[in-house]
Amino acid sequence: MPDILFLLQGARNGWPVSLAAPFPESCDEANWLANEEKFGCTLALSGQTAKTIVPVGSIEFVNQYLSQMGLGPMEAMNIPPELEQEQFLGRRIFRDVSKTELSRLRAEFGPLLLKPGRHPKRFEAIPHEERLLGEIPDNELLFVSQMIPSQFASEWRVFVSRGRVMDIRPYFMEHWLAPDAAVVHDMADTLREHPALALDVAVLLEGGRTVAIECHPFIACGLYGFEGPKMVSMARDAWLGELRRQKSHLLGHK
C-alpha cells in the first residue's frame, strides 16, 4: 500500500486529463529512486487504500473531493502578503474590493485588472471596464491590481517548495528572455512558509525588469512540462498544506 495515492481526474477517453497525465510515470520514477512504493495513482477509488489520497485535476474536481470530505473549496492565492513588496510587483494591489469601490480606485490609480479574490477561476482576469462588470458575481470580493504599463517579453512559471526553486518553465514568449535569477530566488525565499506553490513571473519588454504576476497553490496547477519526483512530492505537500489550512480555519470558527 503506498503512502500517497493520487486520485487522477479522468477524461472521456478514459485517460487522465492533461493536468494529471504526468503523474503515473513521475510516481514510478519517484518509487524507483526511493526503492519503495511511496506513491501510487488511480482513476477510481475501487477498494484501494492509502494513508493519504490526493485529488489531481481541475479546480472543480478538487473542490468536489473537498466537499465529499466535508471541507470548503480552495481559496485564491493571487499575491501572498509576503510578496507584496514594490521591488517584486512594480504596481499597487488591493485586496477584498467590492464592485462599488472600483470607480474610485480607477480614478486614483488608473487602469485596473480584476481577479476573483476568494474563489480561483470563478471568472477569468478582466480589465476594469463597465461593460464587463456584469461577468463578475456580485458576492465575489475582488483582487485588484494596477495594470503594468509595459508589455511582457516573456512569462514563466516558477515551481517553489518551501522557499526553494524546484523548476521553471516558460508559458509565453514574445522574446526569449529569462527572468532575473536573483530576483526570482528572493521572491521564492519570501514564500518559504508555503509548502508548495507556483509563482508566475514576467519579464517586461521595456527595461527587462522581472515582476511577480500571481501565485497558485500547487493543486489543480498547470505544469508546462514540469514532472518527476519533485513534482509528485510538491503535489503531496501542497495537499497536506491545504488540509492543515482548512483544519485551522475550522478551529478558528469554533
Regions found by a protein language model. Name each.
Residues 171-174, 216-225:
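Glycine-rich phosphate/pyrophosphate-binding beta-alpha loops
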Residues 2-26, 30-187:
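Active-site nucleotide/adenylate-binding loops and adjacent lid/helix of ATP-dependent enzymes
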Residues 58, 227-228:
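Short, solvent-exposed helix-helix connector turns and helix-capping sites enriched
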Residues 146, 166-212, 230-251:
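A long amphipathic alpha-helix within ATP-dependent nucleotide-binding catalytic cores
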Residues 157-160, 208-221:
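A short beta-strand motif that forms the metal-chelation/ATP-contact edge
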Residues 118, 148, 203-205, 217-219:
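Short, flexible loop/turn elements at secondary-structure junctions
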Residues 129, 228-230:
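Hydrophobic alpha-helical segments
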